[in-house]
Every structure is written in structure tokens, then in C-alpha cells.
């Protein structure tokens, strides 16, 4: 399982906030973070192995909310990408009922919520999933009475069972989210996005496109590079760059970055750094946008090295090209397949948000 877990974590190690800051060595900070993470994930995977068996690891990530409760015998999984909620337990249906209610009524505030512990997430008077899920009568799930009635309906009418490889029996329910759940989540953050866009001079649709690609507007998002929140900011790289730009010392805390206001401000600040510092010499705005998107994922240094090992020569070559050429090169010649796909995804998402405005 340990080998499986490490393989599962590898795609996240290059999440969006690999800072392009030249000349600053973050190896020591990264080593400390990953050592602590190794201990945490080792303990966590041991619990899941013991209770659920092999090949049953589910863990919170950028676009997946996963919360274990009841000493890890019950879990809730919200796939913000697929738009589906699965809640399952190895205990009695009362525990399933409790988990359904708490999941449907969880708040949007991820600060202080330990996704690797086994306690319940508090019920909120302003549920994050409000407007994204409806009950069996088509009504919004706005309070505990509606959520409890829906949970009872699901257990009485939609309960399913499956058997794990370790012989344990699991009871579960599956709840689809509404068709436009992504748009509903995006709208929750539009005021903050517009404020940051105006403050830093960054296109609103670009912020939306990056946020959808990074987290699918999941406020609980986390990667195993310790990228945090809606815009997946890594504290010791992009976060440190942003704090330096703002005249602050150190780096943002996890709690700081789980605040949507802080997270969006930090992510958009980092885009400003890419636009006005690391990639400042690129003259065509469309070419610069393509470079910024790719750099948000892989770092400005990696982007420029696609064109030339010398920074000034790389910028000169970019400026001799049409934007379409820059796009083609970054989506075909970048050594990172993740970075190649990232530009494709963000550009597509940005176009979608431009149309909807």
C-alpha cells in the first residue's frame, strides 16, 4: 500500500504553484514539508488499509473532498469533477444517516478542518453544497430538517451494498449533483475574483479558468505538494513569492490559504508576478497569457527553457513568433506532459467563461 500511495501522490507533486523564482533554494523547506507529509500519509494509509483493505484508498485531493468519520469506518466522497457524492459506511445505517446530513450541510470554511482525522465536519447554516444538490422532491437542501428527511429517503430507497476484498460489507448511497454544479460554485466566488482581477489587472476569465482547472472550485482542495485551496497555492514557493512582493516575511500558513479571500488574492498576486516580473519582456499579450498559464503550473523558468536556455534569448524568440506558434510549442514541446495538458485545459476553460460573461 505504501508504494501504491506514493504512486498516487506523484501527480500532485508538481501542482500549480511551482514557483519560477530564480536563485532561491526551497529544497530544505520542501524536504521538511514532505517528511511531515510522509508521516501523516503513512499513518492515514495504515488506518485505511486496516479498515477498508487494499485498493480502497480514498484521499482528499484537488477536486475530491474525502472525509472519514466514525474512527475511519464511514467516509464521504464528493467528486467536484464528476459531480457525484458517495457516502458509505461499514457500520449501521444510523451512522450513514449522520454522515449524509453532515456532508450535505458542511460549510465552505475549510480552516481548522482536518481531512485526515476521523471527526465530523460541523453543520453550517450556510451549506457549501446549497444549490448544487437537490433532494428527492427537487428542493434545495438548506437546513437540517430537509437534510435529515433526504437522508432517511436515501437509506430507505437508494441504499446499496458491496463487499470489500477483506470481506467487510459496505452500505452506501450515491447522490448526483445538478448539471451546472460547477457554475454554481464559481458564482460563489465571483465577488472575490472580480475584486482581485481589478486590483491586479488580471483578466477575470483567466482567474476562473485557472481556478476550475486547479480545484474545480473546491475550497477544501489540497495536493500532496501541499498546494492549498481554490487556486492551489504552495506556501513555500508561490506563497513566499507573494509575501515578498507584499513586503511580508516568511510564507502563508495553511490556515491563511484556506481562507478563500486570502487564497484568491495570493493566486492572482502570483499571476501578477508572472505577468509583470518573470515574463515581463514578452510583448504580445496573447503570447504572454499562454506563457503565464503554463508558468502557473510548471514555473516561468521551465516555460522559458522550452524556447532557449538563456532567459533573454527565450523572450526574444517568443517575441518573434505569432501567439499561435507559442501556444503550439508550449502544448507540444514542453518536457512536462502535465504542463502541456494544463495550458490546453485552462485555455479551454477560460474561453468558456468568456462566453458566459
Swiss-Prot record:
Membrane topology, as annotated: Lipid-anchor
E.C. number: 4.2.2.n1
Biological processes, Gene Ontology terms: cell wall macromolecule catabolic process; cell wall organization; peptidoglycan metabolic process
SUPFAM superfamilies per record: Lysozyme-like
GO cellular component, one term: cell outer membrane
Catalytic reaction equation(s): Exolytic cleavage of the (1->4)-beta-glycosidic linkage between N-acetylmuramic acid (MurNAc) and N-acetylglucosamine (GlcNAc) residues in peptidoglycan, from either the reducing or the non-reducing ends of the peptidoglycan chains, with concomitant formation of a 1,6-anhydrobond in the MurNAc residue
Lipid-anchored residues (N-palmitoyl cysteine): 16
This protein's record includes keyword S-adenosyl-L-methionine: no
Keywords: Cell outer membrane, Cell wall biogenesis/degradation, Lipoprotein, Lyase, Membrane, Palmitate, Signal
Cleavable signal peptide: 1-15
Pfam families: Mltc_N, SLT
Source superkingdom: Bacteria
GO molecular function, one term: peptidoglycan lytic transglycosylase activity
Family, as annotated: Belongs to the transglycosylase Slt family.
Function: Murein-degrading enzyme. May play a role in recycling of muropeptides during cell elongation and/or cell division.
Protein name: Membrane-bound lytic murein transglycosylase C
Amino acid at each position: 500500500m505504501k508504494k501504491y500511495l506514493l504512486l498516487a501522490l506523484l501527480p500532485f507533486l508538481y501542482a500549480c504553484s511551482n514557483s519560477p523564482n530564480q536563485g532561491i533554494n526551497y529544497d530544505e523547506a520542501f524536504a521538511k514539508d514532505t517528511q511531515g507529509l510522509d508521516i501523516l500519509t503513512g499513518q492515514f494509509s495504515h488506518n485505511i488499509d486496516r479498515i477498508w483493505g487494499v485498493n480502497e484508498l480514498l484521499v482528499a485531493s484537488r477536486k475530491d473532498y474525502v472525509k472519514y468519520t466514525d474512527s475511519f469506518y464511514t467516509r464521504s466522497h464528493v467528486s467536484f469533477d464528476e459531480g457525484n457524492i458517495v457516502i458509505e459506511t461499514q457500520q449501521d445505517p444510523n451512522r450513514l444517516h449522520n454522515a449524509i446530513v453532515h456532508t450535505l450541510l458542511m460549510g465552505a470554511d475549510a480552516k481548522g478542518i482536518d481531512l485526515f482525522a476521523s471527526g465530523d465536519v460541523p453543520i453550517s447554516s450556510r451549506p457549501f453544497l446549497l444549490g448544487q444538490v437537490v433532494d428527492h422532491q427537487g428542493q434545495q437542501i438548506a437546513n437540517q430538517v430537509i437534510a435529515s428527511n433526504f437522508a432517511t429517503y436515501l437509506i430507505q430507497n437508494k441504499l446499496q451494498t458491496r463487499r470489500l476484498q477483506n470481506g467487510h460489507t459496505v452500505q452506501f448511497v450515491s447522490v448526483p449533483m445538478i448539471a451546472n454544479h460547477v457554475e454554481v460554485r464559481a458564482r460563489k466566488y465571483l465577488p472575490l475574483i472580480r475584486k482581485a482581477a481589478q486590483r491586479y489587472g488580471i483578466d477575470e476569465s483567466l482567474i476562473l479558468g485557472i481556478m476550475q482547472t486547479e480545484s474545480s472550485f473546491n475550497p477544501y482542495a489540497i495536493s500532496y505538494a501541499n498546494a492549498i485551496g481554490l487556486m492551489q497555492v504552495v506556501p513555500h514557493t508561490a506563497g513566499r513569492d507573494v509575501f515578498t512582493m507584499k513586503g511580508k516575511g516568511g510564507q502563508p500558513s495553511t490556515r491563511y490559504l484556506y481562507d478563500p479571500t486570502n487564497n484568491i488574492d495570493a493566486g492572482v498576486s502570483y499571476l501578477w508576478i508572472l505577468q509583470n516580473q518573470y515574463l515581463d519582456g514578452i510583448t504580445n499579450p496573447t503570447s504572454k497569457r499562454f506563457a503565464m498559464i503554463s508558468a502557473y503550473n510548471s514555473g516561468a523558468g521551465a516555460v522559458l527553457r522550452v524556447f532557449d536556455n538563456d532567459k533573454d534569448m527565450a523572450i526574444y524568440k517568443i517575441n518573434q513568433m505569432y501567439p499561435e506558434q507559442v501556444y503550439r510549442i508550449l502544448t507540444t514541446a514542453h518536457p512536462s506532459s502535465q504542463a502541456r495538458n494544463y495550458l490546453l485545459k485552462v485555455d479551454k476553460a477560460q474561453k468558456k467563461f468568456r462566453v458566459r460573461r
